[in-house]
Amino acid sequence: MDAASSSLALSNIKLHGSTNTLNSDQRISSLCSLPKSRVTFSCKTSGNLQVRDRSTGLVVSCSSSNGDRDVIQGLHLSGPIEKKSRLGQACCSVGTFTVGEFALESQSQAVDDKVGVLLLNLGGPETLDDVQPFLYNLFADPDIIRLPRLFRFLQEPLAKLISTYRAPKSKEGYASIGGGSPLRKITDEQAQALKMALAEKNMSTNVYVGMRYWYPFTEEAIQQIKRDGITRLVVLPLYPQYSISTTGSSIRVLQKMFREDAYLSSLPVSIIKSWYQREGYIKSMADLMQAELKNFANPQEVMIFFSAHGVPVSYVENAGDPYKDQMEECICLIMQELKARGIGNEHTLAYQSRVGPVQWLKPYTDEVLVELGQKGIKSLLAVPVSFVSEHIETLEEIDMEYKHLALESGIQNWGRVPALNCNSSFISDLADAVIEALPSATALAPHTSSTDADDHDPFLYAIKLLFGSVLAFILLLSPKAFMVFRNNFLLNYTRIYGYRGERSEFFWVRLIFT
């Protein structure tokens, strides 16, 4: 967009700390070239400015001839807004929209937006008593256990059955890391750090935390957002790479809530679905890895071992989950950054946390560790690349189980890169991501699913829940009945659908009954 087509008449502009007041025909191109100052102004658009709601304000962004880009922060531009001058000739555009001819009024017409940021995460049990209900919430998610449509009425009863069965072993894991997950505490700290980072960038926000499977649930965060009167929302899942089982599941919950609420359905929302490509994230990961490599006697001989959370192959091949491609690209970007710093270590990627008898993304972390030991690798640096917070999969699975396996397999020197947590450069980059996402905020697109549609019929839902609960109760109390049901269920399912180990539905059937 050239300077002529992007110019914007402004009125009621005052430079703080200066006696100068700009004329009403002052152009944005002049504003961008101003020295560092604090600017407030108000405006109202008319004409053919292509925005969804002409009553909304504008976010002005400036780009310079050297390729840099910056944003005059704030919505409705009622400031105060800090803008640092850039080197090179500057031209401007308004948000991500096309600008034509439009007028501005001298009186203030815009109302400040109240910006909210919603951080989404998995959640985790904070005490051992929380483990079983947490697991129930996890397995009751249809994006985790993808039952065939014919058997969806079993979702909640089977979640109860599986969570009861798995709780004792899971409790052992949480007991080994202090009796509960630190995920909520760390995520709360990240939220506070992000709020401060945004404030330093002259963006006043409320930051909320919404967990998918434990407190504070996403539903609780949304209710607080409504009470606070938020007028523009950025949703930031704390998963660098997108998967239908993480970010996808959380977005599905949001879509359902927004569809059923008049206030929420009109709330402008921007969702950052993935952010693994961001330069700040890549550099932050490289910083941590570079620091850990220095702890080895011979850093150049260390094998860099990326361990990512796995998903069933069927998610990728049948459901179109981009997780595998995004993960591989993420690893490539991190290694490119390290290479630019003169670090050329060998590296490999493996996937952890698989369960059940069917194929997950390969190679598997435990198998690769054994192979590396057999090949004579003596030094290894584990990098948990799916996680930005410490939790059971880093503190127990990697630090205990995989470390023990690695040392047992012949690896002598073990190191592990810490999760990003509240790393300052990482948090600053998340703040930039939020600011960049604001101009694209629109009402959340409606989405319907057959599962949600069934839930709207209370009579049908009650029948399904009753039947499934009775069946699960019988199976839980009677091992013989459980085995009979298992054998007949698998036999009939195979006859109907055929044995295709990559089918996500068949995977969960086998997972539940084997």
Curated annotation (Swiss-Prot):
Q: Report the top EC class in one word.
A: lyase
Q: Which InterPro entries match?
A: Ferrochelatase, Ferrochelatase_AS, Ferrochelatase_C, Ferrochelatase_N
Q: Does the keyword Transit peptide apply?
A: yes
Q: Which domain of life is it from?
A: Eukaryota
Q: Quick one: which pathway?
A: Porphyrin-containing compound metabolism; protoheme biosynthesis; protoheme from protoporphyrin-IX: step 1/1
Q: Which reaction does it catalyse?
A: heme b + 2 H(+) = protoporphyrin IX + Fe(2+)
Q: Which GO terms describe its biological process?
A: heme biosynthetic process
Keywords associated with the record: Chloroplast, Heme biosynthesis, Iron, Lyase, Plastid, Porphyrin biosynthesis, Transit peptide
Under Enzyme Commission nomenclature, its number is 4.98.1.1
Q: Which SUPFAM superfamilies match?
A: Chelatase
A GO cellular component annotation here is: chloroplast
Any idea where this protein resides? Plastid, Chloroplast
Q: Which PROSITE patterns match?
A: FERROCHELATASE (PS00534)
Q: Do the record's keywords include Chloroplast?
A: yes
**Molecular function as annotated in GO:** ferrochelatase activity
Family recorded in the similarity comment: Belongs to the ferrochelatase family.
Question: Sorted alphabetically, which HAMAP family does this protein's record hold?
Answer: Ferrochelatase
Function comment: Catalyzes the ferrous insertion into protoporphyrin IX.
Can you say what this protein is called? Answer: Ferrochelatase-2, chloroplastic
